[in-house]
């Protein structure tokens, strides 16, 4: 499958996905970008590491921007999630600055925890 076929397939998945699935896809993308950044860092490819962490930060910012506290049953929980996403983005900025794999791992673990909870509330 060539690159253009993958893009078409990705666009089809996004256009057909439920809002819940779109959030899952963003989280999966964030985790993938962080894994790619770690791989680039281990190879000494600092430019690629920066690019992948930048994309992970954009994804986390997108998740944060998608929060709707006014529609939540528990607005305080949304505020805590907002603060967590903010923390995650800041940690990735710092991880990028100092080339720290442990910081990337920390954010990956946090995002996995959030994703596990999100996956558990999937609509039936």
Language model regions located:
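Solenoid-repeat scaffolds in large eukaryotic assemblies
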Residues: 49, 56, 104-107
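Preference for long, well-ordered alpha-helical segments
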Residues: 103-124
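Short, small-residue-biased leader/transition segments that mark boundaries at the very start
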Residues: 1-3
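Short, well-structured hydrophobic secondary-structure segments
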Residues: 32-52
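Amphipathic, charged alpha-helical scaffolds that flank and support histidine-based chemistry
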Residues: 92-108
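Generic structural signal for well-ordered, non-transmembrane alpha-helical segments
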Residues: 54-57, 61, 86, 112, ...
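Short, solvent-exposed, charged loop/turn and helix-capping segments
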Residues: 62-78
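Short, well-ordered alpha-helical segments
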Residues: 30, 74-85
């Amino acid at each position: 499958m060539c690159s253009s076929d993958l893009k078409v397939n990705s666009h089809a998945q996004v256009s057909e996905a439920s809002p819940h699935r779109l959030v899952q896809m963003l989280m999966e993308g964030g985790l993938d970008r962080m894994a790619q950044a770690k791989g680039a860092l281990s190879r000494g490819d600092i430019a690629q590491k920066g690019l992948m962490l930048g994309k992970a930060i954009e994804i986390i910012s997108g998740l944060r921007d998608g929060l709707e506290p006014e529609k939540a049953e528990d607005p305080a929980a949304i505020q805590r999630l907002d603060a967590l996403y903010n923390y995650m983005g800041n940690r990735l900025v710092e991880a990028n600055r100092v080339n720290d794999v442990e910081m990337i791992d920390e954010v990956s673990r946090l995002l996995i925890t959030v994703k596990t909870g999100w996956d558990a509330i999937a609509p039936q």
